[in-house]
């Protein structure tokens, strides 16, 4: 209970601070501008940026326009039949077993433009897995974890220069899977997905920086996220797992501006650290840390201005102390705006 209060207060304070900055009186020109000007936003929205699905493994860097809503159904799966050892190595060097893991993790993500600079979101999920480990088989289907998300964009890209957009990302993970008595999958993670990966069934507070630059016909996005893993409890004792770092680097090549058809090359990494931000020694989980490096080719296109689709498959290319897996995935966006016209983020 203390942990959830702490995280809830942290998220509330961040939202309150950034909303106050939005509503405050204009800041003198010689001071630092906490948000882009109306002229900068207008210039950006008139530049090349065709409506399309966008990245699969990353939330859009630029925020929703005020009053615009998106709801996304995301189906992410995992097929893992070999494992990496204690040294970082390529997928070709992974060894069969000892865990064979098959997972499907559907989620529904919603995001809404509170202002032209702040976007609020939430994500709920389910998780099913089938696994064999050392001859023992397990399977489970249940609720996944719930994420509360806020994005704040203090800098918007300038089409006339090299300046990119810069967005601050905050995510609070609530362990609804644990509250619903869902069983943890081997390794303690659901499949790598659109949101920064966190440990299944545990509180987590993620802070991240995201950036994007459009260079017709290419869009380039990158991000880094740090997740603080809250202390857990087992048999009346506190447990401490390592914090987690996620990174993304994504290239989108839009081939048809009208249909939003294009292909993506997306690089995703997940690192389990051997330390914690609070300084506690690690006494649970993978104490030696782990690394997963993957590359995903994907296709994206629009059925209409309201329905946007992407399909891809993430392939693990290297890893350490982790399962060597492939991750087929499908993503569908439904977009809505009170004015009837969808604006690309």
Where do the language-model regions lie?
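Short loop/turn motifs that connect adjacent beta-strands in outer-membrane beta-barrel proteins
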Residues: 32, 59-68, 117, 156-166, ...
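Surface-exposed strand-loop-strand hairpins of Gram-negative outer-membrane beta-barrel proteins
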Residues: 39-48, 76-105, 136, 191, ...
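Residue-level signature of outer-membrane beta-barrel architecture
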Residues: 62-64, 112, 124, 152-154, ...
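Detector for outer-membrane/organellar transmembrane beta-barrel domains
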Residues: 66-82, 189-190, 194-282, 334
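Transmembrane beta-barrel strands of outer-membrane/channel proteins
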Residues: 73-77, 122-126, 166-174, 222-228, ...
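Outer membrane beta-barrel transmembrane domains
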Residues: 82-94, 238-345
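Outer-membrane pore/translocation modules
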Residues: 125-241, 287
